Amino acid sequence: MQITIRGHHLSITPAIEENIRDRFTQMTKHIDQVNSMQVKLSKDHQLDKRSKKGSANHIAEAIVRLPGIELFAQASADDMYNAITKLTDKLKRQLDKHRKMQLDYQPMEILAT
């Protein structure tokens, strides 16, 4: 499985990269069909008009490619680590739903008459 990590308006530290790789490999250890993952981390600066103070909103986005399907999730938080945690939780729910649909699928049998 290939994991690509990019940063937009921020640099990816080794600690953040290790956190992402640990969480994503742990999340996908039961699913061997994952072809690739792309993770984009960004920092959005917002300015409050009344107080003239800015706040940074950290955004984490990911695309997970499986055979025949692409899953996308996005999460934001005040801290990058919290955004990554929210992102992996969302993707885990999507992967569990996809895996459950695959397990529930049973081809129809044609009965001879």
Swiss-Prot record:
GO CC list: cytosolic small ribosomal subunit
Gene Ontology biological process: negative regulation of translational elongation
Q: Which UniProt keywords apply?
A: Translation regulation
Q: Which GO-annotated molecular functions does the record name?
A: ribosomal small subunit binding
- What InterPro entries does the record tag this protein with? HPF/YfiA_ribosome-assoc, RHF-like, RHF/RaiA
**Described purpose of this protein according to its UniProt entry:** During stationary phase, promotes and stabilizes dimerization of 70S ribosomes by the ribosome modulation factor (RMF), leading to the formation of inactive 100S ribosomes.
UniProt lists the family membership as follows: Belongs to the HPF/YfiA ribosome-associated protein family. Short HPF subfamily.
Q: How does it assemble?
A: Associates exclusively with 100S ribosomes, which are dimers of 70S ribosomes.
- Protein name from the UniProt record: Ribosome hibernation promoting factor
The organism is Acinetobacter guillouiae
Q: What is the lineage of its organism?
A: Bacteria, Pseudomonadati, Pseudomonadota, Gammaproteobacteria, Moraxellales
